[in-house]
Amino acid sequence: MLEAIEIRCFAMVGYSGTPLWKKLGYKTGMSAYVEGEPNNYISLLGLPADAVVTWLPSAKSEMEFVHLFTTSASKLRRKLESYRKRISLGGVIWVSWPKKSSRVKSDITEDTIRDVALPMGLVDVKVCAVDEVWSGLKLMVRRRSA
């Protein structure tokens, strides 16, 4: 679990040449809740030196950014149900699962995440590689048409 701290580090880039913080949509001044992250998550992000992100110590109401790392479909369901109730309108939930090539034991695929998220009123809007082990799927609350 990340503590509420100010983060300053050097930018790192992934496969696309785009820093992970940009792919995920981190912005300076935002608050974020991250759960189950790999030990090198902060260095993977590669936030700019002047970026300030507040890491929430626990899930709370009206969150604007959540990133869950999990290998378990049952945990995914429990956590998404909880986050869905707490995410702000326009907020983002990233779910990361191990790539098959990582050989990390998991019962989650990209389709599993959609199967759980869509009935909850969440829609997937983006996918990205987090690192050599983790992929990520960006979810948002489905907007109701007027």
Language-model segments: residues:
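Short, glycine-rich nucleotide/cofactor-binding loops
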Residues: V66-L76
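Mid-chain, well-packed structural core segment of small domains
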Residues: R78-D107
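N-terminal and secondary-structure boundary signal
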Residues: S74, Y83, R142-A146
